[in-house]
A protein has these predicted regions:
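Specific transmembrane alpha-helical segments of multi-pass solute transporters/efflux pumps
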Residues: 18, 22-23, 52-102, 138, ...
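Membrane-interface helix termini and inter-helical loops of multi-pass transporters
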Residues: 24-33, 91, 140-153, 203-223
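Juxtamembrane C-cap of transmembrane helices in multi-pass membrane transport proteins
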Residues: 18-33, 46, 84-93, 101, ...
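Small-residue-rich packing faces within the transmembrane alpha-helices of Major Facilitator Superfamily
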Residues: 20-21, 45-49, 133, 192-196
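Glycine-/small-residue-enriched transmembrane alpha-helix faces in small-molecule transporters
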Residues: 1-42, 149-176, 197-200
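Specific alpha-helical transmembrane segments that line the substrate/conduction pathway
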Residues: 38-49, 77, 86-126, 163
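Transmembrane alpha-helical segments that form core, pore/gating elements
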Residues: 51, 109-110, 115, 148-209
Length: 227
């Protein structure tokens, strides 16, 4: 294996590790320290500041009005919709369920791409979709049978599925413009729209967030910073 392939595999492993830790860490602060809506708003605002700051140093790119609308819908589905459903799922289900159901994202992308972009679905792809969907349904039914609060667990798992679907829609509808603009340009506009969309529910919950109050501590702040 070449050096570049080793670096590529290492980057993928590091990315999966970072995202894998994100869910259990978020579970420890939601909702005790911050509500799902406030968490989403804080994440969007922080990312907006970061990407617009980086954008000041990057080459300028003009974004067309039609593409701005595509970015807006991408922000609505992929960032606000996916993140709100993810944060609310933390209230009801386990990090393990969230992570396993999230593995269905490639399958959801394939189905939505077939509907929106008319991409062909082969027999192998269809078989993969059925296997993946069966696994997610098995998790939902098993967790409902094991847990005493089955209704809450059902809600959490369904929110996970909403997270998968909204994020898949985001990936599909933003695919064409991702080839025309740099990642920095797309992210700075997408997070800006996301911050504006998440502002009303997020700002109303923010004053009650204990993570920013006197009860907070550096360890909790560190967890929030990681997320």
């Amino acid at each position: 294996m070449t050096k570049d392939k080793w670096l590529g595999h290492g980057a993928i492993l590091a990315t999966n590790l970072i995202f894998g830790l994100n869910t259990p860490i978020a579970k420890t602060i939601v909702p005790e320290w911050i509500s799902p809506y406030a968490l989403t708003f804080v994440r969007m605002v922080f990312a907006t500041l970061v990407f617009w700051g980086i954008g000041l140093l990057a080459p300028k790119e003009e974004v067309g009005k039609r593409d701005l609308w595509t970015i807006f819908w991408g922000a609505l589905f992929g960032l606000v919709g996916a993140q709100v459903s993810f944060a609310n799922a933390l209230l009801y289900t386990s990090p393990v369920n969230i992570t396993i159901i999230a593995a269905m994202t490639p399958l959801a992308v394939m189905l939505i791409a077939a509907l929106i972009l008319k991409e062909p679905v082969t027999f192998k792809k269809a078989a993969g979709v059925l296997i993946g969907a069966s696994g997610a349904l098995l998790i939902i039914f098993q967790s409902s049978a094991i847990n005493t609060d089955s209704s809450g667990n059902w809600i959490g798992n369904l929110l996970c599925i909403v997270n998968v679907i909204t994020y898949a829609i985001y990936l599909v509808i933003t695919r064409p413009i991702s080839q025309r603009y740099s990642a920095i340009t797309l992210m700075k506009w997408m997070f800006l729209f996301s911050a504006l969309i998440s502002f009303p529910p997020g700002i109303s919950d923010l004053p009650e967030a204990k993570v920013f109050g006197t009860e907070s501590n550096p360890f909790v702040i560190l967890k929030l910073s990681y997320i």
